[in-house]
């Protein structure tokens, strides 16, 4: 597997992965985190423009997609709980793997860790598969953050290399 910046021509494959992820979430007790239209095309376009959008390729096919930045996350400034530290960190958002892939999400998370050595991430309380992945990868539960515009709460996790 390898990671690269996403390109506009990757968007159809990324959208197919997001559609599968939404269906997977609904079928696994998490119908509201991404609903029917998240992430929006505007979010995808913004991630591409800011060079925050990545794809994971496996044998020439896009196996996963995610957003990654080391520019911080405004919603992480206030947490009910405590982050492990105040050091600079990377943020992973909108990680999703294609149907039938194995190990792509772990590979993406490990790649992000290799970029900066300190990762923060959040997920929905109903997203048990993601919580399981974070636990398997050694992330520490730090508390609860509030999304912007009153869109709800998320469980917050952090890990150091």
Region locations from a protein language model:
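Conserved acyl-donor/pantetheine-binding loop and adjacent beta-alpha core of acyl/acetyltransferases
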Residues: 67-100
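Conserved active-site alpha-helix within GNAT-family acetyltransferase domains
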Residues: 126-143
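A short beta-loop-alpha structural element at the N-terminal edge
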Residues: 2-16
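Conserved GNAT acetyl-CoA-binding A-motif
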Residues: 115-126
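Conserved catalytic-core motifs of GNAT/GCN5-like acyltransferases
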Residues: 122, 140-154
């Amino acid at each position: 597997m390898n990671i690269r910046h996403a390109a506009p021509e990757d968007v159809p494959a990324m959208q197919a992965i997001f559609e599968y992820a939404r269906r997977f979430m609904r079928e696994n007790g998490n119908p509201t985190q991404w609903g029917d239209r998240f992430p929006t095309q505007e979010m995808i376009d913004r991630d591409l423009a800011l060079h925050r959008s990545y794809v994971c390729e496996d044998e020439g096919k896009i196996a996963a997609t995610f957003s990654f930045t080391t520019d911080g996350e405004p919603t992480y400034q206030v947490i009910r709980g405590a982050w492990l530290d105040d050091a600079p960190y990377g943020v992973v958002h909108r990680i999703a793997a294609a149907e039938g892939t194995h190990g792509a999400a772990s590979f993406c998370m490990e790649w992000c860790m290799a970029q900066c050595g300190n990762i923060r991430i959040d997920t929905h309380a109903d997203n048990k598969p993601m919580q399981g992945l974070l636990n398997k990868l050694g992330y520490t539960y730090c508390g609860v953050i509030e999304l912007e515009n009153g869109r709800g709460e998320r469980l917050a996790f952090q890990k150091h290399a």
